[in-house]
C-alpha cells in the first residue's frame, strides 16, 4: 500500500518541493495544497491544489479556507495531512477535525510573539486559544527548535499530541551544490551588480521591520564609517509584505551603498559573492533556511540571538550572535569578520560541516517518513507520546560540542 501525504502550506509552499520529492523517493504518494502558483509543483510532477487565505487577517477568508481544505481532504482522502506555517497549522486541523492523522510543524512563532507592539500583544490570546483548539485534532506536533517546544508545553498548547523535534525542513545539499557549480562566476555576478572589488555583506529575507531590516540599515552606516568599501546587498521581496514591508524610501536613503535586488531564484550563486551573511531578524524563527544556505555556501554568519538562529550559529565557532534591534552590536560583529578574513573563512568551513551533518534533507525526510508510518500503523489519531516522539529536549545542535569546531 502506498501511503498518501497531503502537505498544506501558504504562498511560499514551493520551498517544500524538495521535501515532498524526498518523501516520494521513500515510497510515499505526495500532494500539496497552498496559496501560491501551481507551476513549480506541476514541473515537479506533484499534484497541487490551490486554496485561499489572507496572511494578514480576514476572518471571512479564513472560514472559507477551512471549507476549501475540508472539501479537498474529503475529495482526495490522504492518509496523513502535514502542515507548515502559522495559518495552515491552525486552519487545517479545523478542516480535518480528527478524520485523518494530521502533523503540524511549528516553523517559528513569528511576529506575534517577537514584537512588543500593541497589535502583536493583542493577537496573543487569540493565537493561544486557536492553537489549543487545533491541538484537539492534531496527531503530532513537530518543532524545529527546542525553545518553541518549551513554549508550547509551558502554555499547554499540545493537547494530547506528542512533541517531536526535527531540526529544520532540511536542505537539498546535492541540489545546492549543483546550482552553485552551474552558476555564473563570482566575477561575472559582481560585474552585473556593479560591485567591483568591494566587500559584500548579504542579507536574504523578506524586507520587513520584523526581519530587522531597519536595524541592518543603521548598522550599515556604522560599518561604512570604518570600512568605506563595503556594500550591503539585500535579497528578498518587499512589495508582497503588506503593512509589514519596509518603506522603499528608507532603503533608497542608503543607496548606493545598500542595494535591494528583490526576490531572486539564484540565491546559491549570489552567496558566492558575500564576505559576510547578516541575518538581523527580530522574529521567532523555526530554523531559518537562509542560514542553512549561507552555512552551506561557507559564508560566515552574523545572526540575532533569537530562537532558531542559535541552532545554526554558535558564537565564535561558525559566526556571531548579537541581540536583536541593536545596530551597534550588529555592526561590531560584521566588522570583526571583515577585519579577520582568515578566521572568518574557518568559521565558514565549520558551517559547511554542520549543515551537511545536521540539516541534510535526507536526514530530515527519514525522520518525517518514520513519524508518518508510525502514526498510520497505530490506526488512531495519536499514540502514547513516549512511544511516538523523540523527547523535545533532545538537543542535536552543534552546541553539544561545547562551542568547538564540529
Task: Kindly give the residue locations of the regions a language model identified.
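Glycosyltransferase donor-sugar binding loop
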Residues: 33-38, 171, 204, 231-245
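Donor nucleotide-sugar binding/catalytic pocket of nucleotide-sugar-dependent glycosyltransferases
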Residues: 49, 128, 132-184, 195, ...
